[in-house]
Amino acid sequence: MAPVVLELRRFEDLAETLLVSTGQHDAILLAALSTFGLTPDVDLGIMRHGQSLAQVTTRALDGIASLIEERKPSLVIGQGDTTTTFVAALAAFYARVPFAHVEAGLRTNTIDNPFPEEFNRRVAGLVADLHFPPTSWAADNLLKEGKEPERIFVTGNTGIDAVLEAAENTQTPWYPDHEGRVVLLTTHRRENWGDPQRRIAEAALELVQRFPDVLLVVPMHPNPQVRELLVSVLGGHERIQLIEPPEYPNFVKLMQRCKLILSDSGGVQEEAPAFGLPVLVLRDTTERPEGVHAGTAKLVGTDKREIVEQGARLLGDPEAYREMAQAVSPYGDGHASARVRYRVFEFLGIETPSVEDWN
C-alpha cells in the first residue's frame, strides 16, 4: 500500500490521504513503511497478547468504524486479504462510505484456504465500489462473480512498484556474506502451522544436507508457535541462518542474492519473478496462478518428499533451473500505483494525469 499512499500524496493539494494502521505486527509494519518515508497517521493499537482472531476483528472494526465516523472520508481504500482490509470494507459499508479494493479478484475458490484470507478478500469484493485487480485473470474472477465491468480496472500489482523501488536503494548492503548458493525459506501461513510447517522445515534441512554449497536463510515470523517449530528443526546448523524479519530493503536485497525461494507467502510469489527467481510455493492452491502459468513458480504443497524432489531438481539440474529463472514476471511494470491514483481521483470527480493501461 505504501506506493499507493505516496502516489496519492503527490496530489495532496487535491485531497488529503490518511494512513491508518490497526497496530498488528507493529515493528514489521513501521520498518517497512520507513523504507518509503511513511508513518501511520493513526495507529489504532488493537493488539493484545494471546487474543483470538475474533477479538482482533472486533477491536479493529470498533476502531475503524469510530475513525470513519470522526473523519467522514470520501473513500476508504484497503489492500489485499488481511483482516484489516476485511474490517475496513465492512466498516465502510456500514457507514455507507465507498470502498476501493487494491489487489482485488484473487481467488482459490476454497473459502478456508488460505484461512482466513480467502474469506477476507471475498467480503471486500462484495462491498467494493472500485476493484483494482492486478491481472486480467483476477479481473475475470470478478466478472464471473457478477461485478460491474465499469468498476473493474486492471492495474498490475502495487507490490511490484514497492519491490522495484526498494531494489534501487543502492545503500542497502547485500546479504548474506556467503560464497555459495543461498536458498530463502519463508513460512508463516496459518493453515501451515503445526505438522505441515514441520514437514516444510524438515525438507529444507534435507536440501541443505544434500547440497554442501547451500546456505539456507529463514526470516522468522513473530508468532511464537512458528518460531519454536523452526528453531527445533533448523536451529544449530552451521549453514542455516534463522534471522529476525529484515527491514524491507534488506529483504529485497536478500531475494536478489538468492538462487531459489521456498515460500508460502503470496507477496513473495509476486516479487521474486521480478528478479528472475524461481519460487517453490509451499501450498496446495494459490490465488496467484499467473506465476505458475508463466513458469516462474511451482506448487509443491507441504509434502516433504515433493519439496525435496523439486528443490533438488532446481539446485541440481542447470537446465531445469534456467527454464524457471528465464520466465517473465506477469504481475506488473512498476506503475500500478499511478493507475490506482488516476481511477481513485476519477471516481471522486478530480482530474489527474492518466496512465497507460496494464496488460
Q: Which residues does each PLM region occupy?
A:
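Nucleotide-activated sugar donor-binding and catalytic core shared by glycosyltransferases
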Residues: 1-218, 223-359
